[in-house]
Curated annotation (Swiss-Prot):
Pfam families registered for this protein in UniProt: RRM_1
Keyword set includes Hydrolase: no
Source organism, top-level taxon: Eukaryota
Repeat listed as a keyword: yes
Gene Ontology BP term (one): cell differentiation
Source organism per UniProt: Xenopus tropicalis (Western clawed frog)
Alphabetical list of InterPro entries matching this protein: ELAD_HU_SF (IPR006548), Hud_Sxl_RNA (IPR002343), Nucleotide-bd_a/b_plait_sf (IPR012677), RBD_domain_sf (IPR035979), RRM_dom (IPR000504), RRM_dom_euk (IPR003954)
Family (UniProt): Belongs to the RRM elav family.
GO molecular function: RNA binding
Protein name: ELAV-like protein 3
Segments forming domain RRM: 35-113, 121-202, 260-338
Length: 343
């Protein structure tokens, strides 16, 4: 397999790299992380030896790790490579990013350093003009820094009309802070009222209860009763994120091409996509949400799906939201398995 991979790599290298790195990788990494790479969307049957051989063909590797599920031992579809020489890391990005392996197109980018400068850079924006699209929102915010992801919530019925609410994730917190200073309370072109720009609450802080209470209050018209966490039934340590699959009680099927699919159960009949966006958006980049509806009544059948691009953020969302009470219902949140309901 390795020989075929390297042959494919040499054929594709002349075409240049593929699309840019995803959320948890950036070509603007700090100097102390110029050798450390994250590799996403690897074929699930790829072994540690094949992974090392592929990236070892570029240059000397100090360490590499193919990340596996703690329970099943199956590859989670991503890994880390640390080169001795920064030039080799740069070459690996230019050569291997966008390489097609089997049915996958791998993404190679610098692993983002774990520092306060890149944490908590996710913004919640409301009262946007209904005519503003995602590109226009990015243009409005891009003057303050590099945007990693953005999303505007749309009406479920039309699938296109904006709800006037969006999320913007910057590369660095200081950029997000500047965006708040510059845009919060301002009226962009086409707006009938000032927009609100604020940080999406950080789930890693000791304010998880306040976060979900706030989220519940935003949807209070659809739900009744307070929001509570079932602390006696569901507990977790924020530092043991790898144990989330044990908490959820399921094994993973691995990421989809779009990211990690999360199953959300026990939603009320009145729940819609905006509820899922507001619940999961603050935890990280969400690429898609879907509430499963009854064809006759168009009411929620009690469950839905959320896709997030980053495993750690998805795991944190599960650990924080599994067992929380939304209205009079206790949510059950886990990674989607093949045995669960299908849309």
């Amino acid at each position: 397999m390795v020989t075929q991979i390297i042959s494919t790599m040499e054929t594709q290298a002349s075409n240049g790299p593929g699309s840019v790195g995803i959320l948890n990788g950036t070509n603007g990494a700090a100097d102390d992380s110029k050798t450390n790479l994250i590799v996403n969307y690897l074929p699930q049957n790829m072994t540690q030896e094949e992974f090392k051989s592929l990236f070892g063909s570029i240059g000397e590797i100090e360490s590499c790790k193919l990340v596996r599920d703690k329970i099943t031992g199956q590859s989670l579809g991503y890994g880390f490579v640390n080169y001795v020489d920064p030039n080799d890391a740069d070459k690996a990005i230019n050569t291997l990013n966008g390489l097609k392996l089997q049915t996958k197109t791998i993404k190679v980018s610098y692993a983002r350093p774990s520092s306060a400068s890149i944490r908590d850079a996710n913004l919640y924006v409301s009262s946007l003009p209904k005519t503003m699209n995602q590109k226009e929102m990015e243009q409005l915010f891009s003057q303050y820094g590099r945007i990693i992801t953005s999303r505007i919530l749309v009406d479920q019925v039309t699938g296109s009309v904006s709800r006037g609410v969006g999320f913007i994730r910057f590369d660095k917190r200081i950029e997000a802070e500047e965006a708040i200073k510059g845009l919060n309370g301002q009226k962009p072109l086409g707006a009938s009222e000032p927009i609100t720009v604020k940080f999406a609450n950080n789930p890693s802080q000791k304010t998880g209860q306040a976060l979900l209470t706030h989220l519940y209050q935003t949807t209070a018209r659809r739900y009744t009763g307070p929001l509570h966490h079932q602390t006696q039934r569901f507990r977790f340590s924020p530092i043991t994120i790898d144990s989330v699959t044990n908490l959820a009680g399921v094994s993973l099927t691995g990421p989809t091409t779009a990211g990690w699919c999360i199953f959300v159960y026990n939603l009320s009949p009145e729940a819609d996509e905006s509820v899922l966006w507001q619940l999961f958006g603050p935890f990280g980049a969400v690429t898609n949400v879907k509430v499963i509806r009854d064809f006759t009544t168009n009411k929620c059948k009690g469950f839905g799906f959320v896709t997030m691009t980053n495993y750690d953020e998805a795991a944190m969302a599960i650990a924080s939201l599994n067992g929380y009470r939304l209205g009079d219902r206790v949510l059950q949140v886990s990674f989607k398995t093949s045995k669960q309901h299908k849309a």
